[in-house]
């Protein structure tokens, strides 16, 4: 079940960015599993990609090509084209070349993206056979259809949209994402596509994407696994009648940054809310760290602990598991006598032990909620970090045990 995730909000079209969806029948006949996105001429494109050493063939190709002129993005679901070696790279190149031929653009201007089962050959002919239909379907209004088209084990499509005014001109930022498992970015089995009609210099756009991803997609985790295929792309078409953003400063940049960050955060958190088998949406907030890295180390130790995640599923306030995770996070010279731990506003541990004011009934009441905050005060400094995660349920095991059947 998706925790607090409802129908898609209104996804405003972005002038200069079109999406087309078609069926290749990669995993199921009739399933719309190929999405083509067209960027207007002159668009700037930036991306962040998985750090998994076994990154998929489309990731290798997209990382090479994103530095040049990008006109099309080609996504398929049902097959990750990962762990496929040189033949997989050739297959990705072939699908891009076919799309380029049909669209009349250089092959190097097409970026491929794949998600699905790892280690199986990409069904090139099926994908090639769907490309013309996807091109024929191109429209600025197809965001919702594309959000559904990129889904794998997701139960709901994910998207967000913002608009703001600058000098009387409306600027739009719209994005979609997919992902429900194998989520522990830097990046994870997650794909994200965000577009704006602002005109943004490539260097500014790249930094904006990196910063936005770092504060959103790189702060979510479901199962601790980092996928071979993660990518998040930010496209600026330049169709809004405004000056180009050439510096990371000024009113237009700040408004754009706010909109991009909000869209990134909303679609990233939607991935957690739709986590495979998730029944809880959990915020892990770590304050008082000596540096940001030790805050992240503590946060991920808590967020990845199977014992904590199963306690969350059972609504069991087993606070000792949280203390154990904090203690093994590897923070040097950690003084446990300074640490306080909270479930929402309930102090469950103080100065390294059970809080004198804590009762089991208080903890149980918080743990019974669908949305929970675990707050850890380290008492070592001024740094803070926040991570979003889920519980671990029977359904998660079932989904992943049956994924290939």
Curated annotation (Swiss-Prot):
Keyword Amino-acid biosynthesis: yes
Substrates-to-products reaction catalysed: N(2)-acetyl-L-ornithine + L-glutamate = N-acetyl-L-glutamate + L-ornithine; L-glutamate + acetyl-CoA = N-acetyl-L-glutamate + CoA + H(+)
Site (Involved in the stabilization of negative charge on the oxyanion by the formation of the oxyanion hole): 115-116
CDD domains, per the entry: OAT
GO terms for MF: glutamate N-acetyltransferase activity; L-glutamate N-acetyltransferase activity
HAMAP family listed in its UniProt record: ArgJ (MF_01106)
Role played: Catalyzes two activities which are involved in the cyclic version of arginine biosynthesis: the synthesis of N-acetylglutamate from glutamate and acetyl-CoA as the acetyl donor, and of ornithine by transacetylation between N(2)-acetylornithine and glutamate.
Subunit architecture: Heterotetramer of two alpha and two beta chains.
PANTHER family listed in its UniProt record: ARGININE BIOSYNTHESIS BIFUNCTIONAL PROTEIN ARGJ, ARGININE BIOSYNTHESIS BIFUNCTIONAL PROTEIN ARGJ, MITOCHONDRIAL
The protein's name in its UniProt record: Arginine biosynthesis bifunctional protein ArgJ
Gene this protein is translated from: argJ
